[in-house]
């Protein structure tokens, strides 16, 4: 069983590459196939069916070579993003089979169905790569890092097309800003680009460098008649030769005319001489209504009025809260005074009650002394 499936893996490795099925270039796919051989197949497929299954799988794998090789479908190369998408789809379906724990004939059917499906998915991804990603430049030279499926190697590919990207007609009014744009849609995807250089081209074919840098724009403020003429932009690369060359023919137009209109509060002589006409509404369709003077409310005035109302309401609430606080304070103060008076009255009453027995005793003592004195005086008189 191990030998048969090893041969099957060899067939996969040998047949997928000539058929330019690039998923075999992904190390994760190779690891998944190895895991399938060592862990899944020994317990899910009977040994007597290995030879027949292997032949059928080899035939199915050879069918990957049916991909048409032409400029519009497949050239035997892909980019890294397309390879990742194809590998992810293959690994997802293979994991689905192993997670389902299918065995025997059902496993074989699932495996064949997965191989056919992955062939169609890979063909779709490659066709999209050929149409949208592979050499999208219409002019100039573009550099791309691509993967050659027959070798599983990354190499730099140069999409060489006409270096002349045409001439652009630029019209700008005097005293306005002139902007020359040298950026193309494929520049961000190209590799090995350096600086944008803008030149002024004179009549004797000589050139003057105006700017050089990473910015793809040349801006000239307040242009005049002397700025009219021919310009050239060149995008340099790390290799020999530019990636893009664009020419510009600049025409400086006269300044824009500004129509002067009288202010609305000044009445012209024509308006004074013209009698006021009263527009009478008619039954004709879409009559012109008589202009009615309306008071236009500016947003600033509305905002100021709203803020003023909010301030007034806030001030009223503040005054009301202050008045309520003062009344509450006075009320609590009166209550405290009343409680103090009551406390003092009760203390005075208690003191008077305490002093009353002492006063009674003193009164009795004074009366006794009075009687004693009076008796002594009577005795002295008798003597």
Curated annotation (Swiss-Prot):
InterPro entries: Ig-like_dom_sf, IZUMO, Izumo-Ig, IZUMO1. SUPFAM superfamilies: Immunoglobulin. GO terms for molecular function: protein binding involved in heterotypic cell-cell adhesion; protein homodimerization activity; receptor ligand activity; signaling receptor binding. This is Izumo sperm-egg fusion protein 1. Residues 167-251 form the Ig-like C2-type domain. The modification Phosphothreonine is found at residue 372. Izumo is the name of a Japanese shrine to marriage. The gene is Izumo1. The modification Phosphoserine is found at residues 339, 346, 366. GO terms for biological process: binding of sperm to zona pellucida; fusion of sperm to egg plasma membrane involved in single fertilization; heterotypic cell-cell adhesion; single fertilization; sperm-egg recognition; syncytium formation by plasma membrane fusion. Disruption phenotype: Males are infertile and spermatozoa show impaired adhesion to the oolemma. The extracellular domain assumes a distinct boomerang shape when not bound to IZUMO1R/JUNO. Interaction with IZUMO1R/JUNO triggers a conformation change, so that the IZUMO1 extracellular domain assumes an upright conformation. It comes from Rattus norvegicus. Expressed in sperm (at protein level). It is a single-pass type I membrane protein. The keyword Transmembrane applies. It comes from the Eukaryota. It is found in: Cell membrane; Cytoplasmic vesicle, Secretory vesicle, Acrosome membrane. Belongs to the Izumo family. Monomer, homodimer; disulfide-linked and homooligomer; depending on the context. Interacts with IZUMO1R/JUNO. IZUMO1 and IZUMO1R/JUNO form a complex with 1:1 stoichiometry. In gamete recognition, IZUMO1R/JUNO first binds to monomeric IZUMO1. The weak, but specific interaction with IZUMO1R/JUNO induces IZUMO1 homodimerization. The process follows a tight binding phase where IZUMO1 bends the entire structure towards the sperm membrane side through a thiol-disulfide exchange reaction. The molecule no longer binds to IZUMO1R/JUNO and instead binds to a putative second oocyte receptor. Glycans are attached at residue 204. The chain crosses the membrane at residues 307-327. Residues 370-383 have a biased composition (Basic and acidic residues). GO terms for cellular component: acrosomal membrane; acrosomal vesicle; endoplasmic reticulum membrane; membrane; plasma membrane; protein complex involved in cell-cell adhesion. Disulfide bonds join 22-149, 25-152, 135-159, 139-165, 182-233.
């Amino acid at each position: 069983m191990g030998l048969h499936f090893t041969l099957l893996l060899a067939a996969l490795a040998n047949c997928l590459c000539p058929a330019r099925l690039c998923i075999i270039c992904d190390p994760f796919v190779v690891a998944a196939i190895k895991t399938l051989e060592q862990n899944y197949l020994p317990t899910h497929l009977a040994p007597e069916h290995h030879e027949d299954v292997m032949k059928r799988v080899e035939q199915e794998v050879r069918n990957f070579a049916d991909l048409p090789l032409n400029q519009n479908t497949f050239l035997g190369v892909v980019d890294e993003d397309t390879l990742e998408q194809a590998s992810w789809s293959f690994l997802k379906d293979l994991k689905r089979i192993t997670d389902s724990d299918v065995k025997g004939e059902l496993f074989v059917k699932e495996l064949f169905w997965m191989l056919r499906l992955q062939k169609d998915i890979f063909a779709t991804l490659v066709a999209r790569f050929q149409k949208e990603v592979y050499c999208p430049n219409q002019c100039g030279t573009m550099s791309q890092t691509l993967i050659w499926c027959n070798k599983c190697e990354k190499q730099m590919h140069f999409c060489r097309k006409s270096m002349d990207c045409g001439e652009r007609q630029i019209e700008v009014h005097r005293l306005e800003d002139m902007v020359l744009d040298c950026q193309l849609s494929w520049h961000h995807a190209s590799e090995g680009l350096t600086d944008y250089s803008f030149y002024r081209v004179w009549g004797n074919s000589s050139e003057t460098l105006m700017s050089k840098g990473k910015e793809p724009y040349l801006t000239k403020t307040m242009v005049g008649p002397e700025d009219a003429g021919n310009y050239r932009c060149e995008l340099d690369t790390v290799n020999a030769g530019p990636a893009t060359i664009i020419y510009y023919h600049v025409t400086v137009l006269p300044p824009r005319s500004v129509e002067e209109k009288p202010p609305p509060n000044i009445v012209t002589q024509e308006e004074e001489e013209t009698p006021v006409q009263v527009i009478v509404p008619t039954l004709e369709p879409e009559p012109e209504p008589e202009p009615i003077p309306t008071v236009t409310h500016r947003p600033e005035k509305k905002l100021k009025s709203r803020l003023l109302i909010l301030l007034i309401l806030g001030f009223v609430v503040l005054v009301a809260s202050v008045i309520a606080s003062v009344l509450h304070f006075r009320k609590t103060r009166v209550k405290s005074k009343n409680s103090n008076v009551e406390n003092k009255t009760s203390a005075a009453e208690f003191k008077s009650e305490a002093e009353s027995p002492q006063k009674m005793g003193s009164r009795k003592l004074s009366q006794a002394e009075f009687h004693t004195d009076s008796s002594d005086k009577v005795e002295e008189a008798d003597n």
